[in-house]
């Protein structure tokens, strides 16, 4: 492999001649060759957005020559578009500040900008990775800003639209099923009736509240650390640089980012992301309940609850012919477990803000973006390939309703709790109908029984 010589503050490093990265990236490839997971492309794009925004501000302030600024912007745009995606090989498991990744982006943009200006890669002339691309910046404010940009863009553009899709479908099902009366279950035992629509309205409300929590916690993500540089003081920036670069970032992303009023907390801690992850955790908890209920209610087809008919997307067994499984429910529940686990990792990582810098940034970024990505994808699939096609099994629902002993609850106000309990126990012991045992006691007539024990009337206050 042909090499070229690059240098940094430590010395000379041989870099593959066809690559845009430089010495810092090559060192990281050697010293942090841990695992297979590379830094999320969204972080790379977000850092490039910061670089182009800084170059624009510096050009306006006449702190960088126009041709250099223009070349940086053009190179940054290529990074953002994914054109240079093979130039970012670094693993998540690196320095806790993300310095190697920031320098990876600096070097790639620098060398590509040099190329645009007809220079020679690796010379750092006329575009220097630190003096020009990283001007007025530190990894310590760039990486947390990139984290917030990534979280905001991925949530707004992917996660929330997919959650909204599921919300709409659950609401639609709650209306579609509003006249279907079924037996309720508490403690996995028979309980009083409700409508299938009421049951689905509970799922709808859970998801609606989850979306609201995510939207509320997203507000703090819109505050950016950029302009704080090394420890939050803004050293090596001109006054109001934070406001100007944030304005450029907002303009490009079409998201109303704002400069964090206190840069120290945004660099030393990641409470906003820990809190945001908590809202994803709550959403995962809700989705776990919803998807489990749906797959349990769809169990069978003959030896389970069988109250829901789930879409048949693919064969379910390599040995049992004709078997179909609730695979979408299984996939989304596995994602929920991962999101809950990611939140634990983020919470622990959030505690490691030692003095002026949290040093678990790459882990936090990896976990939160993975959670957003997995939730977004799984919810979309769950919506389109499961919830949308759910149908009620009316015969099975009626069978369970008619056989339930808990309909006796409606008699309690008329004949008393103790008498109602005795009737239910006798019906169970004798394998007889509730109505038969109730009339046999002489406490109530058949006419009264039929009037009181009316499942549809039991789905609301009397």
Where are these regions (language model features)?
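Conserved, well-structured ligand/cofactor-binding cores
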Residues: 1-462
